[in-house]
């Protein structure tokens, strides 16, 4: 176990006597999904299949939702949705806890996410993100951010929903960080609504501390820990939209964060 993982998490993981059994049960199912459903999903995402159906019921989008939900179940996660995602072009803004966040939202509605470029190299998640039209950016690059902002506006104007994590990085699930306001300008430029989305992984309305990344923890150690975790809920709350206020993107960011904090029951 990575020594950088929270000190309250590592002892609990070591003392979990059922963890080997969960690995034994879930790993074959995970491999099966990669071997069978992966190629099926790839077939569904080709240009011809993408034209089957219309709106949110295209074969492509249904396959993304199914594949994402199946992947979460491989990790023992029970999806619990509250509220409804807005239809059409929307800027979804969510708190960021885990690499699972993109998969969880995709299980409800496929969207083009803005995500760090490293995710493209991650197994399962990277493939899903790339096929679903994720907009990758290089952290710390002003040029990359400008391109990302322009791409987001173009996608929104074309009717494609976009998802962002305005905190700028994942947290530990015990609080919601400050939302950076700049990304909210894309909703103003494209004249689309902003819908806050609250995410949580745990039981009885409490965030499980073993799901978020530990300090300096890499993807694979976290992936393995989550794979062996006891079953828990994966909550996705679609909240009341935030009114688009010209020249007030900071207020839009604050209101979005406030609604997520209130929904999750965190102190500000």
What is each stretch, according to the model?
Residues 1-14, 67-82, 100-102, 178-182, ...:
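Soluble, non-transmembrane catalytic domains of enzymes that act on hydrophobic metabolites at membranes
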Residues 12-80, 127-131:
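A transmembrane-helix-recognition feature enriched in membrane-embedded lipid enzymes
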Residues 61, 95, 118, 142-145, ...:
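A conditional alpha-helix N-cap/helix-loop micro-motif detector
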Residues 89-94, 116, 137, 160-165, 197-199:
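Generic beta-sheet signal
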Residues 97-156, 160:
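Membrane-embedded segments
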Residues 124-127, 174-255:
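A cross-family acyltransferase "interaction/gating" segment
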Residues 155-184:
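Catalytic-site beta-strand/loop segments enriched in glycine and acidic/polar residues
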